C-alpha cells in the first residue's frame, strides 16, 4: 500500500477574508481562453471577472467557476478601469513593456485589478496609459510569450501566494 492515497476532490481551503482582486479582460478572440480564466478564478476564490466584447463562457471548460464567479460583460475596458481606480484598486496590466516588473519580484497590493489583454494585440495603448504598473512573466524559451489563459493563471497564482489567507 502506498503512503499516498489519491483524493479526487479535497474541500476548498478556508480563507480568512474574501480576495480583493478583480480580473479585467480585454475582448478575446477565444471563448476557451476566457472560460479557462474563469475556471482558475473560481479555484482561487476570486469572485469577479470583467469581460469585454462578445464574451461567452463554455461551461464545460469553466466548470464550477461559471457558477461561483460573477462575470460582468462590458463593451470596453477604459471606463471599467476608471471605475476600478476610483474604487481604490491598483491597476496592474499583464504585459511585456519597457517598464514591466518581473512577476516573481512584484509585490501586489491586496486591492488589485489584474488587467488582461487580447491574445494577439495584448494591452493596447488606450489601456496602458490607465495602468499603475505592468508585470511580465519571464520566458526562457520559444515562443516569446505565453498563452493568455496560462499567463493569467500564473499571475493569479502569484497574487494568491502573496495573500494566501485571502
Question: Model-flagged regions — what are they?
Answer:
Residues 1-166:
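Post-transcriptional modification and biogenesis factors for structured RNAs
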Amino acid at each position: 500500500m502506498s503512503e499516498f492515497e489519491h483524493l479526487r476532490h479535497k474541500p476548498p481551503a478556508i480563507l480568512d477574508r474574501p480576495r480583493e482582486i478583480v480580473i479585467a479582460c480585454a475582448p478575446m478572440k477565444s471563448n476557451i481562453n476566457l472560460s479557462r480564466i474563469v475556471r482558475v478564478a473560481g479555484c482561487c476564490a476570486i469572485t469577479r471577472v470583467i469581460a469585454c466584447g462578445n464574451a461567452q463562457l463554455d461551461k464545460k471548460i469553466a466548470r464550477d467557476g461559471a457558477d461561483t464567479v460573477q462575470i460582468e460583460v462590458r463593451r470596453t475596458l477604459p471606463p471599467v478601469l476608471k471605475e476600478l481606480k476610483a474604487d481604490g484598486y491598483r491597476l496592474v496590466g499583464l504585459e511585456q513593456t519597457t517598464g514591466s516588473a518581473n512577476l516573481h519580484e512584484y509585490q501586489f497590493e491586496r486591492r488589485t485589478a489584474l488587467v488582461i489583454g487580447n491574445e494577439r494585440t495584448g494591452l493596447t495603448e488606450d489601456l496602458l496609459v490607465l495602468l499603475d504598473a505592468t508585470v511580465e512573466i519571464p520566458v526562457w524559451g520559444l515562443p516569446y510569450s505565453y498563452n493568455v489563459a496560462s499567463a493569467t493563471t500564473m499571475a493569479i497564482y502569484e497574487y494568491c501566494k502573496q495573500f494566501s489567507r485571502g
